Amino acid sequence: MLCPGTLFKYAPQFDDLLVKLGKKIGKCQFVFFRQHPKWASILRARLEDSFKKAHLRADDYVVFIPWLNIADFYGLMQKADVFLDTAPFSGFNTAMQAIDCALPIVTKEGQFMRGRLASGILKRIALPELVTQTDDEYISLVARLVQEKNYCDQIRQQIIDSRNILYSDLQPIRTLEEFLINQLR
């Protein structure tokens, strides 16, 4: 499972989600990027503590890899089972890249805009079923995508079939233009 967000976005409450996912799914890996050594060491230490409290070894589940060039990054996204969006600070650029690679995203929608970026993308491409509201929903959905290949493949195909709307719909731009023009009057 790919965790490609900027490391500071992974709040401590996300640690427990990973532990619960590890327990539910069993043998699995959460792949993070070491873009900043200090942030990586802080996150790794936190995850080690969280997994240890659950009588699990973080090293059996958590992997930090070097930052990749764009071709390798897209290659990894195309091979991953699922993209775990950061909570409570959602990803946008990485979520768009995941959509480019037809990688299913699971997000937990936040209260504020910063926690609704990926959910906005998913809703726009008619995949609201990938947007969760609770930890239990998040865990169940991730487990289903990882354990049910047919379901995961169906979601991938839905992404492929609907992702062009994110690039070809000019209505949001026209709405913003209208708003800005009205503000100048």
Where are these regions (language model features)?
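C-terminal amphipathic helix plus adjacent low-complexity
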Residues: G5-L7, K23, F33-H36, I42-S50, ...
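Residues in well-ordered alpha-helical elements
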Residues: P12, A71, D135-D136, L170
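Short acidic active-site motifs
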Residues: A71-F73, N93-T94
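Conserved catalytic-core segment of nucleotide-activated headgroup transferases in glycan assembly
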Residues: M1-N69, Q78
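Charged catalytic carboxylate motif
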Residues: Q13, L17, E137, T175
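Catalytic binding pocket for nucleotide-activated donors in carbohydrate/polymer assembly enzymes
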Residues: Q78, V82, T86-Y167
